[in-house]
Amino acid sequence: MQQMTPRKAAVLSLNSSIKNGKYTNLELDAAIKKYGFEDKDKAFFTRLFYGTVERKITLDYIIKRLSSVKFEKIEPLVLCILETGLYQVFFMDKVPDSAACNESTELVKTICPKAYAGYVNGIMRSAVREKQTILDEIAHLAGSFGLSVKYSVPEWLCKMWQADYGESREIVKALSRVKVGVALRVNTLKISAEELLSHIPKELEAKCVGKTSIVIPRSCIVTELYGYDEGLFFVQDPASTIVSSLVNKNSVGTDKPFVVDTCSCPGGKSFSMAINLGNEAEIHSMDLHENRLRLVRSGAERLGITCIATHECDGRKPLTEYFGRADAVVCDVPCSGLGVIAKKPDIRYKTYAEIEKLPEVQYDILEASKNYLKDGGFIIYSTCTLRKAENENVVQKFLDNNKDFELCPTGIFGDETGMVTFLPHKTGTDGFFAAKLIRKK
């Protein structure tokens, strides 16, 4: 039986991810577990797999330029072989061009009809010969199409960011490269960030961000870090931690506040708020799916948080027994996720049609969630996307239809408007949005 190689595994995993619509991180984890690679091969496989996903638009541009066959007619497995092969040529300096060509050609013979071997070999050798010419050509591509090809982000997305924020290039550059590290939200009920940092291996190059977060830029296994089993931290980007900090002892103004988290899974914001409130609150964490709520309960148990109750509930159909009781409501609504494509590279390949109707769902959840609030209470509306249609526009529509609500300054990055956008090239965080809406007394 032929041994599984990192190159072959990358091709098969890419094809499986596309064919089955599986998230790339899940596909990667499954492959690593299945094939049991040693560290060196695992690192090569991970780089090749994620890198090819990250650079797919760029690689497909090169294939279209060199192929004698129409792009749409290239067999899926052959396309994956070409993409991984060209990624090695253009983006993996330590891989000899000859190895990339030969291995790609041999790979065709093992998993595709052998007739394709000459076709793949021809494209690979043409790419090596014309490498610098192709790179120069891509560097000189202009406008939104040029941005799309250079950074492998869909052209419609480049155009939208330019229209929404006026700085498409900076956003695209910040979000186009896959992040391999992780951010931890420290459970300050049990330990300080500085003390936890002292237990993290120096080679991971971890650093504290504020008093509650630790950022680790290196790849690591979170469950093997010091303090995981003891509940000393959980995974949460600093942007989400900052937004969660808007619900604290001072902002709610009561000893045991009543808080509703309408779209809570996997639980990060509920955990953060519980810690902010000293585990002395009544937090109701809701989600549409019971199997996801199990993550909230198990996470709370690991962290030693006892003030969270979970409820299976559609955010658009609020639980009437809690109407008029909440001091604070958090609506971290389902969104397009365009602010986190550096962590989840497959998100960038969503089509506009896939996200077009999200603002309707988001507005319905926000509109329903207002019923939980008491007079003087506030709503935090948030997303992990960079798209005004899902952010400012939803909030403005809500304000237009609910005159008993008004924006309240968040104070985040000096915000005085009540709405704040985390642009990753400026904040160093995920792309994020938050608004604070207070119900008038």
List each model region and its residues.
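S-adenosylmethionine
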Residues: M1-K441
